[in-house]
Design a protein with these regions (language model features):
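Glycine-centered hinge/linker elements that transmit conformational signals in sensory
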Residues: 193-196, 239-270
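Hinge/lid segment of periplasmic solute-binding proteins
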Residues: 33, 111-165, 220-224, 310-312, ...
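Extracytoplasmic "Venus flytrap"/periplasmic binding protein-like
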Residues: 68, 72-140, 175-177, 182-185, ...
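A structural signal for short loop-to-beta-strand junctions that line the ligand-binding cleft
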Residues: 96-97, 104-105, 133-173, 207, ...
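Extracytoplasmic/periplasmic substrate-recognition and gating elements
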Residues: 44, 176, 260-267, 301-371, ...
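Short, solvent-exposed loop/beta-turn-alpha elements that line the ligand-binding surface or hinge
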Residues: 40, 127-140, 183-185, 207-209, ...
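Extracytoplasmic/periplasmic solute-binding protein
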Residues: 150-159, 164, 174, 188-243
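C-terminal capping/gating helix-and-loop segments adjacent to ligand/active sites or protein-protein/ligand interfaces
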Residues: 393-448
């Protein structure tokens, strides 16, 4: 069958790219939406195996939602959540489960796994469930829905979404003679502030700036500048991505800026581990950092009694934010498996999905985790209003996303080789921060990525 050959080809190309095997002999089929009465026709309790990557407090919040759903469906549906490790580990296990015919009914996959999941031909699009039920997907925040919509179809349901912000230490700004209510808007302004903040110039903190070597952060500089990170309209309109614009003028300028900041003692190279950059900011060693909205609560708690925390829209490379431009979302979404699963299992997974995104569930999820509420009506819930009153900085994220127009430049690049693209971007930045020429480093990364993209595209025809 064509589907089997495609999946086997995906296995080969992902192995060549250094990823785990994807799939084997599972027949492609059973991808249709079940009948509405599928659960009524089922005998006994229908179980939904649910693989996810939420740990610590986020995992506790997710399990609480699962328990609430199960309590409301005793004798009919039982969701069985299983933590499968971080995103990369989870998708590796998913690929192995396809090969062994043991896929979960529902899978949480990170944003950059979107095109792979579509190409795997293993999932039933959420759009199809919604159309069957006349379910209004318009309740999903437009930019978040936009990320998971490819060729006009929403394939998965966002669960945990976030956008990046510029966080800064207002107390340090005041000590350095800077206006704490006028945060930097672009890279030049960050440098100007860092020059006054950094110890090397007699400033109040060790370093003015510090952020993790994280590809998602670099991708945002294309989005906020109104530029495509990948060609083919970021892979959004049907034509496959054949090139990532890693060595574009904006990317080179960004990496050159970052390198010089480190060389001049205005920024610290904290490496790829995001926690290291977070800890440096919490400890007051750095005065500015780039991070997701998921850190609003953590940064606020760390700053309490130590310094006043500020947050601002994600910076642009130069000038001011282009009209309609803004950040693209990150996080993960939910996918419902088709092959190997009964009609009742698919329907039960859909019912659970709807429960997770209803306003009260999303208000709970938002207030417990700091992730962006994907259902816009969640912001009207009393619990969410109380949370925003206590965490007013989150309004910065809401405003930033609200004014960002949905389009190819702001929904992020969707490509089957996106995990490799992101890692390669990190490789380029990392090499530059230890002394390599930024333009040459990114040019080499561009060549390496082109091979990965071509191999993937060849595998799917």
């Amino acid at each position: 069958m064509i589907g089997v050959r495609r999946v086997l080809a995906l296995v080969l190309v992902l192995l060549l790219a250094g990823l785990a095997a994807c799939s084997g002999g599972r027949p492609i089929g059973n991808l249709n939406v079940p009948a509405k009465d599928a659960l009524d026709a089922a005998n006994g309790v229908t179980e939904v195996s649910f693989w996810h990557s939420m740990d610590a407090s986020n995992g506790i919040a997710l399990v609480k939602l699962v328990d609430d759903f199960n309590a409301a469906h005793v004798g009919k549906i039982k969701v069985l959540p299983v933590y499968q490790g971080v995103y990369d580990d989870a998708i590796t296990k998913y690929k192995a489960s396809v090969q062994s015919n043991t896929t979960p009914t529902m899978m949480q996959i990170y944003d950059i796994g979107t095109q792979f999941m579509i190409d795997s031909e293993q999932v039933v699009p959420m759009d199809d469930f919604a159309k069957r039920d006349s379910f209004d997907l318009g309740v999903i925040q437009k930019n978040i829905a936009g990320y998971y919509t490819v060729q006009g179809k929403q394939w998965s349901m966002p669960l945990n979404s976030s956008v990046p912000l510029l966080y800064y230490n207002k107390t340090a700004f005041k000590a350095a003679g800077l206006d704490p209510d006028r945060p930097p808007r672009n890279l030049a302004e960050i440098r100007t502030a860092a020059e006054k903040l950094s110890k090397v110039n007699g400033g109040p903190v060790t370093y003015g700036f510090g952020a993790a070597i994280y590809g998602w952060l670099l991708e945002q500089f294309a989005s906020t500048s109104g530029e495509l990170f990948c060609n083919a309209e970021n892979g959004r309109t049907g034509e496959r991505v054949t090139q990532a614009n890693i060595n574009s003028a904006k990317m080179v300028e960004t990496v050159q800026w970052w390198q010089k900041m480190v060389d001049d003692g205005l920024a610290v190279n904290t490496g790829r581990v995001t926690k290291d950059a977070q800890d440096a900011f919490k400890a007051g060693e750095t005065a500015m950092t780039l991070e997701s909205t998921g850190q609003v609560k953590g940064f606020s708690s760390a700053a309490e009694g130590k310094f006043e925390l500020g947050a601002a829209a994600y910076p642009v490379v130069s000038g001011t934010e282009a009209t309609g431009a803004g950040p693209s979302v990150g996080g993960a979404s939910l996918w419902i498996s088709g092959p190997g699963h009964t009609e009742a299992e698919k329907e039960a997974a859909w019912q659970f999905t709807k429960f997770l995104i209803q306003p009260d569930s999303q208000a709970f999820w938002h207030t417990q985790t700091g992730y962006f509420p994907v259902n816009t009506k969640a912001l009207d819930e009393p619990a969410d209003k109380e949370y925003l009153a206590k965490n007013p900085l989150f309004q910065v994220a809401i405003d930033s996303l609200s004014r960002t127009e949905v389009g190819s430049t702001t929904t992020g690049c969707v490509a089957g080789s996106m995990p490799q693209i992101r890692k390669a971007t990190e490789d380029g930045l990392e090499r530059a921060l230890i002394g390599k020429d930024p333009a040459q480093s990114l040019a080499q990364v561009q060549k390496n990525v082109a091979v990965s993209i071509a191999n993937y595209n060849d595998s799917v025809g």
